[in-house]
């Protein structure tokens, strides 16, 4: 068994390994532990430090690495194992993480009271102001199992400095949960046995948005905004001019929902934003939409100082690019970030081999369902 090619996936922690042999049983399995009855090569791969799990189907493996591990160290060991070669360890400087920070809030009956940020190498926690904790305590009823009822709610992935992101998330939660909302959540918690907070959506006009003087009120408006249409673009463009990055980021999220080519200039604004989280969100939207008109903008994004943005741009060029993009790709072929470099190499290889640009996974699914 040999490796035919290695392909990045939409997840930085997963690589697709295409093999020379196809499974004969047409089954699929996920392997996480070394077990006697498993194929030897699977156990050999699981024995590699940094390999978390393996999904095996047809003629490929999807290998997940531990978040703290680095592909530049793990991938050569995978290659040598599958190709039955001896691996000679050489010193590599571990690649920095993508700047990704996982944000979570500890919730009790819909009331947040603690923030947790996690990177590949660090974790930081911060308690919300006392009135959040007091609200959480007021929401408790006799007989409540607090340990069972409290949950970590995923707030998505953020990008940047840990301290800056913590301050940003802290501000956001305070903005989204004013005292009157906390009081309402407490009342609901005390009046019902099981609390499943439902997202309430409310459409606002441009004038209503502009009349709000507090950015926290504006953020709540955007968070509670229903699926927008092109008729809402003036409001969303207004939000793109705000000083607060959370407002600009949420505006990009909403703009991406419109799914019309007319929104491209607004997503380009997001792609040039000074905040990396806004730029990455715009890149995600452009990737999901898959409009080839965005290719020049994504070529420019290969110069972004944040490697998570460059990686998204390289992924888009792999999904949508053609011969016209080869000069840009080749000029960035030595990107210092290993994952970005690998994605660029894959894009160059696909284009030079004349393989069809299939688009993102979401685009392929959408086309299949048409």
From Swiss-Prot:
GO terms for molecular function: oxidoreductase activity. It comes from the Bacteria. It holds the Pfam family HEAT_2. Belongs to the CvfC family. This is Conserved virulence factor C. It comes from Staphylococcus haemolyticus (strain JCSC1435). The lineage of its organism: Bacteria, Bacillati, Bacillota, Bacilli, Bacillales. The gene is cvfC.
């Amino acid at each position: 068994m040999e490796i035919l090619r290695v392909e990045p996936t939409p997840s930085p922690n997963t690589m697709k390994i295409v093999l020379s042999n196809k499974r004969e049983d047409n089954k699929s399995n996920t392997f996480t532990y070394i077990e006697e009855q498993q194929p030897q090569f699977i156990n050999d791969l699981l024995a590699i430090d940094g390999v978390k799990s393996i999904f095996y189907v047809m003629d490929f493996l999807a290998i997940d690495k531990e978040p703290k591990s680095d592909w530049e160290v793990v991938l050569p060991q995978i290659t040598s194992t599958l190709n039955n070669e001896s691996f000679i360890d050489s010193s590599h400087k571990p690649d920095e993480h993508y700047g990704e920070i996982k944000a979570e809030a500890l919730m009790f009956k819909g009331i947040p009271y603690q923030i947790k940020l996690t990177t590949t190498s660090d974790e930081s926690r911060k308690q919300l102001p006392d009135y959040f904790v007091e609200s959480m305590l007021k929401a408790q009823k006799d007989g409540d199992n607090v340990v069972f009822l409290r949950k970590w709610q995923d707030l998505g992935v953020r990008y940047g400095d840990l301290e800056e992101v913590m301050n940003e998330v802290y501000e956001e939660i305070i903005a989204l949960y004013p005292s009157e909302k906390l009081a309402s959540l407490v009342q609901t918690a005390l009046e019902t046995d099981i609390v499943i907070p439902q997202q309430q959506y409310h459409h606002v006009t441009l004038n209503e948005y502009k009349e709000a003087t507090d950015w926290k009120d504006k953020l709540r408006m955007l968070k509670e905004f229903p699926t927008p249409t092109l008729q809402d673009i003036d409001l969303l463009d207004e939000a793109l001019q705000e000083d607060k990055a959370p407002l600009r980021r949420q505006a990009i999220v909403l703009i991406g929902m419109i799914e019309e080519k007319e929104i491209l200039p607004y997503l380009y604004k997001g792609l040039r934003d000074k905040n990396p989280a806004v730029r990455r969100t715009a890149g995600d939207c452009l990737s999901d939409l898959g409009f080839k008109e965005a290719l020049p903008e994504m070529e420019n994004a290969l110069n972004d100082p944040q490697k998570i943005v460059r990686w998204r741009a390289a992924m888009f060029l792999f999904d949508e690019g053609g011969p016209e993009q080869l000069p840009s790709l080749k000029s960035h072929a030595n990107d210092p970030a290993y994952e970005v470099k690998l994605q660029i190499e894959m894009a160059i290889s696909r284009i030079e081999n004349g393989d069809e640009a299939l688009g993102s996974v979401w685009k392929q699914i959408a086309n299949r369902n048409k």
